[in-house]
Design a protein with these regions (language model features):
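A structural signal for short loop-to-beta-strand junctions that line the ligand-binding cleft
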Residues: 28, 58, 62, 109-121, ...
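Flexible hinge/capping segments at coil-to-helix
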Residues: 129-146
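Ligand-binding cleft/hinge of the Venus flytrap
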Residues: 49-55, 66-75, 137-142, 156-173, ...
Length: 259
């Protein structure tokens, strides 16, 4: 019996040591020690992450999330510039501790972790108002006479290849954006989230959403995290659950999505 208790005690001690070691190696502990939370963000996705041209400061739905998380941790937030093409690589290479919102993607999940989701979007096509009546369905857009613009590194890049396998596809790299190709007349349509599309048609009255029958690819949004750091992932997930219950994300939606 004594031997059984000794083995049980050793197992508990080993488990405690492993847990302590995991915490010490986690980015959570390093963030607390360094006093800063590094957040990779592109700054080009209205209304999620933007850079104010006057102040050069970050603002948006995602910026408020990161700022609130850092405040609850008692640390300062540091925004690290990145692009959609390098977004995943940055969190894997430890250039930042988390990202701003990113669409869930099986390809991204192969190398990076995700938090719980707190929002969802779907894909819609944008075009110039002058082409109203020319395109009325997804099928209309999938033909050799249509040029589709997408931004490198976004989930829309690969989705466009599937949806528009007959069309010509232009891929632009940040800081350029897909919708700018439509504005410049180099593309007939661009594909983005319904969230960004709603903001773009307000910002650029010459643009409109193609009147297709519903969006494509409904996708949850979450933040990218280091895949092997379960301690840090757990902390962020617990924070998201708590903030959801307290109405934080509903407040952000009212603030940023109804403007």
């Amino acid at each position: 019996m004594i031997r059984v208790f000794m083995k049980s005690g050793m197992a508990l001690a080993l488990a405690a040591m492993l847990a302590t070691s995991a915490l010490a190696e986690s980015r959570l502990q390093r963030i607390l020690v360094d006093g800063e939370l590094r957040v990779g963000t592109t700054g080009d996705w209205n209304p999620m992450t933007m850079i104010d041209p006057a102040t050069k400061e970050h603002k948006g739905f995602d910026i408020d999330i990161a700022t609130a998380l850092a405040a609850d941790m008692g640390v300062k937030v540091v925004f690290v510039p990145t692009t959609w093409k390098t977004l995943v690589n940055g969190v894997v290479a430890d250039k930042y501790d988390m990202t701003s919102s990113a669409s869930l993607s099986p390809k991204r999940a192969l190398v990076a972790g995700y938090s719980l989701s707190y929002f969802a979007v779907e894909d819609v096509p944008l075009m110039l108002n002058k082409n109203k009546g020319k395109y009325n369905s997804w099928e209309d857009l999938n033909n050799p006479n249509v040029t589709v613009a997408v931004t490198l590194g976004t989930v829309q890049e690969k989705r466009a290849e599937v949806l528009f396998d007959k069309s010509k596809i232009i891929k632009v790299s940040a800081p350029a954006r897909d919708y700018q190709e439509v504005l410049a007349g180099r593309a007939d349509i661009s594909m983005t989230s319904n969230l960004e599309a709603a903001k773009l048609v307000k910002q650029y009255p010459q643009m409109m959403v193609v009147p297709v029958q519903g969006g494509k690819n409904p996708t949850p949004l979450a933040v990218l995290l280091p895949q092997t750091d379960q301690v840090w992932i757990n902390y962020v997930n617990h924070w998201i659950i708590l903030k959801t219950e307290r109405g934080f994300f509903d407040q952000l939606k009212a603030k940023w999505l109804k403007q």
